[in-house]
């Protein structure tokens, strides 16, 4: 531990063996709170490398139980959170709609830290059992193409270190790790990051973890694809990384103001979700979710481009099938 701390104090990247050792110790609670705080802050100041992030994620995954084997190329759109802008739950609503269109969505998430409502909070408020056992999860997934994996059930180190991390008043490597440690190991990911500078780093980490296709995005300071500003994207495709910017025009959608996406409480987010699924949501809410669903369709080769993905999603919403789909998820999650 002393050698690891000294390396970080001198702003040196840890090698694979050191990262694996460090996170194995963290998992087994062999690191004191003072040491953990020092490590997280030193990593933050140095800047976490994609290798440190990917090896840490691999170590955490090796110790996480896998609930079932799907035999499919699963998709996740979990983001880092931490943008502090308190918007509606764009990625969770997008995952519900995408799964109602047949995409195999294995949604990994937790409760809110910086927003009014995290993915787990929203789903729980909608009536979904967020702590499904493996049998319930597999059954729900097989019948709806949607499964929610509540992070604290699979990664105790996240749960136990949460109070300490909250007291640091800063984002740490744990924010980056959240979207990378889905126990079902999805091969396709739409991953939002709280800082544009992380896009390339996280795309490289996904590549190192064996993800086949991905898009890492930061839209106007949010960890989502947005329509009010430019979305910076790093796309993992054919084992290479493409870097580019997206605007509302790329989706053939009008721009909307960020303020229209912001909410005052969790109840507003829940109602916004229900309204969108019933195709009666505010245009500003619906269209930003549609842009994110379109990106999932594009990454999954279900749409040839983003504009086709938008058209497909808008047509699907007219059927109100996503709302009936949610009711089925709620029922099966408690079965």
Curated annotation (Swiss-Prot):
> What is the required cofactor set for this protein?
Mg(2+)
Name the positions where anthranilate 1 binds: 79
Keywords, A to Z, come to: Amino-acid biosynthesis, Aromatic amino acid biosynthesis, Glycosyltransferase, Magnesium, Metal-binding, Transferase, Tryptophan biosynthesis
Cross-referenced InterPro entries? Anthranilate_Pribosyl_Tfrase, Glycosyl_Trfase_fam3, Glycosyl_Trfase_fam3_N_dom, Glycosyl_Trfase_fam3_N_dom_sf, Nuc_phospho_transferase
Query: Is Isomerase included in the keywords of this UniProt record?
Result: no
Residues that hold 5-phospho-alpha-D-ribose 1-diphosphate according to the record: 79, 82-83, 87, 89-92, 107-115, 119
Q: Which residues bind Mg(2+) 1?
A: 91, 224
Instruction: Name its pathway.
Output: Amino-acid biosynthesis; L-tryptophan biosynthesis; L-tryptophan from chorismate: step 2/5
Q: What is its EC number?
A: 2.4.2.18
Q: For Mg(2+) 2, which residues are the binding ones? A: 223-224
The chemistry this enzyme catalyses reads: N-(5-phospho-beta-D-ribosyl)anthranilate + diphosphate = 5-phospho-alpha-D-ribose 1-diphosphate + anthranilate
Cofactor annotation remark: Binds 2 magnesium ions per monomer.
Q: Give the first-level EC class, as a single word.
A: transferase
Q: Write out the GO biological process terms.
A: L-tryptophan biosynthetic process
What would be an example GO MF term here? anthranilate phosphoribosyltransferase activity
Binding of anthranilate 2, residues: 165
**Job description of the protein:** Catalyzes the transfer of the phosphoribosyl group of 5-phosphorylribose-1-pyrophosphate (PRPP) to anthranilate to yield N-(5'-phosphoribosyl)-anthranilate (PRA).
Protein name per its UniProtKB record: Anthranilate phosphoribosyltransferase
Give the species. Helicobacter pylori (strain ATCC 700392 / 26695) (Campylobacter pylori)
* Name of encoding gene: trpD
């Amino acid at each position: 531990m002393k050698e690891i701390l000294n390396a970080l104090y001198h702003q040196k990247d840890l090698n694979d063996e050191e990262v694996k050792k460090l996170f194995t110790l963290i998992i087994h609670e062999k690191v004191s709170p003072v040491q953990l705080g020092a490590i997280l802050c030193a990593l933050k100041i140095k800047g976490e490398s994609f290798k440190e992030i990917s090896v840490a994620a691999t170590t955490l995954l090796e110790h996480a139980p896998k609930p079932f084997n799907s035999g499919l190329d699963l998709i996740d759109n979990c983001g880092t959170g931490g943008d502090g802008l308190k918007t509606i739950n764009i990625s969770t609503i997008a995952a519900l709609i995408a799964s109602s269109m047949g995409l195999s969505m294995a949604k990994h998430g937790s409760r809110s830290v910086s927003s009014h409502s995290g993915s787990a909070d929203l789903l729980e408020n909608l009536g979904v059992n967020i702590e499904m056992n493996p049998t319930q999860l597999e059954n729900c997934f097989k019948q709806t193409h949607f499964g929610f994996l509540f992070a604290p059930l699979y990664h105790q180190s996240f749960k136990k270190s949460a109070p300490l991390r909250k007291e640091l008043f800063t984002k740490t490597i744990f924010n980056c790790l959240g979207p990378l440690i889905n126990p079902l190991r999805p091969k396709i990911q739409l991953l939002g990051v709280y800082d544009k500078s992380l896009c390339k780093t996280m795309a490289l980490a996904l590549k190192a973890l064996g993800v086949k296709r991905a898009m890492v995005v930061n839209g106007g300071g949010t960890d989502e694809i947005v329509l009010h500003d430019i979305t910076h994207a790093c796309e993992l495709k054919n084992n290479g990384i493409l870097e580019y910017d997206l605007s509302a025009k790329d989706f053939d959608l009008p721009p909307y103001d960020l303020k229209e996406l912001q909410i005052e409480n969790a109840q507003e987010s829940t109602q916004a979700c229900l309204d969108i699924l019933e195709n009666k949501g505010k245009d500003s809410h619906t269209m930003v979710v549609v842009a994110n669903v379109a990106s999932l369709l594009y990454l999954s080769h279900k749409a040839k481009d983003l504009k086709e993905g938008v058209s497909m999603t808008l047509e699907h919403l007219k059927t109100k099938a996503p709302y009936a789909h949610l009711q089925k998820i709620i029922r099966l999650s408690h079965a």
